Amino acid sequence: MKEKVVLAYSGGLDTSVILKWLCEKGFDVIAYVANVGQKDDFDAIKEKALKTGASKVYVEDLRREFVTDYIFTALLGNAMYEGRYLLGTAIARPLIAKRQVEIAEKEGAQYVAHGATGKGNDQVRFELTYAALNPNLKVISPWKDPEFLAKFKGRTDLINYAMEKGIPIKVSKKRPYSEDENLMHISHEAGKLEDPAYIPDEDVFTWTVSPKDAPDEETLLEIHFENGIPVKVVNLKDGTEKTDPLELFEYLNEVGAKNGVGRLDMVENRFIGIKSRGVYETPGATILWTAHRDLEGITMDKEVMHLRDMLAPKFAELIYNGFWFSPEMEFLLAAFRKAQENVTGKVTVSIYKGNVMPVARYSPYSLYNPELSSMDVEGGFNATDSKGFINIHALRLKVHQLVKKGYQK
């Protein structure tokens, strides 16, 4: 009886060759296709997998779970890798790998496989998730397998093999970039972009218009949150209202994209140590992250906010590096959910030519006291108390300066 392997399958050249290669090695290959919002023909992908040799194909729509359990969860900690990247690819991988493990368990498969390369982050994200959720599963990673590497030294070898085995391949001109698309973002890498000094042509971008070509009129959105989670968005100009999580996020993508929001060009540090340039388009999440952070300004205690902000870079790093299912992630999420208990209210954002600008906010749990903050009203605050406050905080500075002068003599 053949041993079963569940392959994370995209329908592209790499995973199609891997599927056939696994079949020829004697495996019963079950292809698993995850719909996380990429614009693919899933019926065609399923047909291609079956023709290539898969005994069964799972095509699953994970978009809603991606939004509610992954994107919105990352929002709780304002996850942003190296202060800039909103982690669109990294957030999707644990969801895909989790479902792959569940299918393997359902099918009684002994193996799981993926087509991630040996230089990138995705190999780590997939395999750490496998290990965390089912340590008994064996992993087949062809791009780290000596036999596979000896047979396929590059794209030409893959194409020749596909043609030899009758695997359908696209003959149309391919975009000269490596791209990953899901509901949260689209990323562009490789090709000319590997030169960090190269200024990308406008044709790199496929989701967003250039801010220069965006409408000359602002869009005002009112975004509502409950305990840090988005629950409603209202367009204050045309009255459009969305409350369903998936529809809400798709609408923010639509509004952000046509207003040139969410473009990012950066060089980042991959987990394995290689620096990589990525060009990203993340319109909807950029709007959400900005609005959410603004609401925290009036609802979160100062020290809680600052402590959370100290932990946020670690949170983003864990997501980026593939530790979504880990004890430290459970710890951080428990803390973040506690910190978000009063992050309830609404924020109005002005969206204009690539910018997302909060212009108003309200919360029933607001810690903002107009009288205390007023420049005109004393409001129960005794200004003379500040003298002692400053003296106490100045004490160590005075001592430090006296000692410093003493050392200089």
Swiss-Prot record:
GO BP term, pick one: argininosuccinate metabolic process
InterPro entries linked to this entry: Arginosuc_syn_C (IPR048268), Arginosuc_syn_N (IPR048267), Arginosuc_synth (IPR001518), Arginosuc_synth_CS (IPR018223), Arginosuc_synth_type_1_subfam (IPR023434), AS_cat/multimer_dom_body (IPR024074), Rossmann-like_a/b/a_fold (IPR014729)
Annotated GO MF terms: argininosuccinate synthase activity; ATP binding
Pathway annotation from the record: Amino-acid biosynthesis; L-arginine biosynthesis; L-arginine from L-ornithine and carbamoyl phosphate: step 2/3
Keywords: Amino-acid biosynthesis, Arginine biosynthesis, ATP-binding, Cytoplasm, Ligase, Nucleotide-binding
Binding site for ATP: 8-16, 34, 115
UniProt subcellular location: Cytoplasm
SUPFAM superfamilies: Adenine nucleotide alpha hydrolases-like, Argininosuccinate synthetase, C-terminal domain
A Pfam family that the UniProt record links to this protein: Arginosuc_synth
Reaction equations catalysed: L-citrulline + L-aspartate + ATP = 2-(N(omega)-L-arginino)succinate + AMP + diphosphate + H(+)
EC identifiers of the protein: 6.3.4.5
Residues at which L-aspartate binds: 117, 121-122
One GO cellular component term: cytoplasm
Entry binding sites for L-citrulline: 85, 121, 125, 178, 187, 268, 280
Database matches in PANTHER family: ARGININOSUCCINATE SYNTHASE
Official protein name in the record: Argininosuccinate synthase
Organism name: Thermotoga sp. (strain RQ2)
Lineage of the species this protein comes from: Bacteria, Thermotogati, Thermotogota, Thermotogae, Thermotogales
